[in-house]
């Protein structure tokens, strides 16, 4: 049958229209979550403080709902402000959301793509996670309790000797929030850092004053919380800028310089540890154990970064170095920050503090120090710790996740490549979940008759708080952190009457306002800025026990082959 030219033209038009309709229907996408209107190209970049976004995110959640979206340049950010939304995406749909956002400067440049916390969900991340879980998991972390006990006893002695030094000397923070080495914050930091350094490298932090090693660790951690904050660098919001030449990309030189700074410290620690291992003089720790196992597999020398491609997936030297960093960071910052917030909140709520002391006196008394076996018998103290973590989460927005595929949630599109944030601050300030959310009310978690349930428990929907994240990226150091928080804070309540500074003219107590965001530092991790506190032993008997315990621990260090304390 012959077909005319007109018929061919009509057929072509019909086919074209059909194809267009089919294509349009097949690719019609759900709408994005609502959010504030931005400006062309830059989006919402200049509408809030990118170094302290959580107060504005809470306001936007109240206006636009539990799931809203913003843009920082070309970077789409989806913010989840209810536990239901975060649980659904990060736990139930974890296959799509187990990657973390990898900031260009913080991950690619400063960390040379080796820092676990910012790795995508990949084979390399699984290798690192397996090794980290092997020493920080629920079983292995309990093996650290002796070290936690001993280091905590040193901490108590340091606070006893410190007395009212922080009040009398009225210290001021140094550049970039640097803590003076004689401030009481440094005593707490020594505890957490020494614990983690012993776990990883088999060496203690046995001195506070004139010890640049201790303070550089926290300078580097503080630096990382700033450079990895979404929106901190324009290149993270506009990835096309990565193609600029060096002369037009100052962040590139800055990132490389910071990497050299980190490797000058962490890289030297690893190199010294490896040399000691090769010489047969190595100390017991994660790095030594891993190098030994790797050598037994015939891979004594394995420079470079990443892991081997074989089934064993042995970590190369730089990946071991940054895995050690990840372990130290996981166990140091959260714990010390929680202690600073706990002391501030308890001093701001004297009735809660009085009740904690009364409970401690009734359960433990003055003839011994509290231990982990007392935890279930100290429900008010545990409730105070949980309420501290709710009111002052160390990571108000957690670690940002990334959508590995397009997804639809509650009718809203979450495009592939979007940064997806679990808004811990908004969840913790939800008046439905926590009535009167800005008030410090430990009774929310007070359960004198039941088994205490920490955030590391299996029930993701009824957790007390969300500071350890969600799903497959749940914080590896959670078990060690919870154990440290309990032993440090229980013994602090047991051993001391701690008190704030007073105004010499009015006699009124001077304390930072816990509900003022300016009380806390900026960045991915937020901690109280330094404030003065004095420490007085609750009795002469408590003081003598602390002194005797300090002397006994020096013998323990000697028998364990670890450095004794220098004060």
Swiss-Prot record:
EC number(s) given by UniProt: 1.-.-.-
Chief place of localization: membrane
Binding site for heme: 475
Protein name: Cytochrome P450 monooxygenase 79
Signal sequence residues: none
Cofactor(s) listed in the protein's UniProt record: heme
Enzyme class: oxidoreductase
Similarity comment: Belongs to the cytochrome P450 family.
Keyword Coiled coil: no
InterPro entries noted in UniProt: Cyt_P450 (IPR001128), Cyt_P450_E_grp-I (IPR002401), Cyt_P450_sf (IPR036396), Cytochrome_P450_fung (IPR050364)
Pfam family, one: p450
Biological pathway: Secondary metabolite biosynthesis
Molecular function via GO: heme binding; iron ion binding; monooxygenase activity; oxidoreductase activity, acting on paired donors, with incorporation or reduction of molecular oxygen
Keywords noted in UniProt: Glycoprotein, Heme, Iron, Membrane, Metal-binding, Monooxygenase, Oxidoreductase, Transmembrane, Transmembrane helix
Cellular component, GO, one term: membrane
Organism: Postia placenta (strain ATCC 44394 / Madison 698-R)
Glycosylation-annotated residues: 223, 279
Transmembrane segments: 7-24
Lipid bilayer topology: Single-pass membrane protein
Summary of the function given for this chain in its UniProt record: Cytochrome P450 monooxygenase that is able to use dehydroabietic acid as a substrate for oxidation.
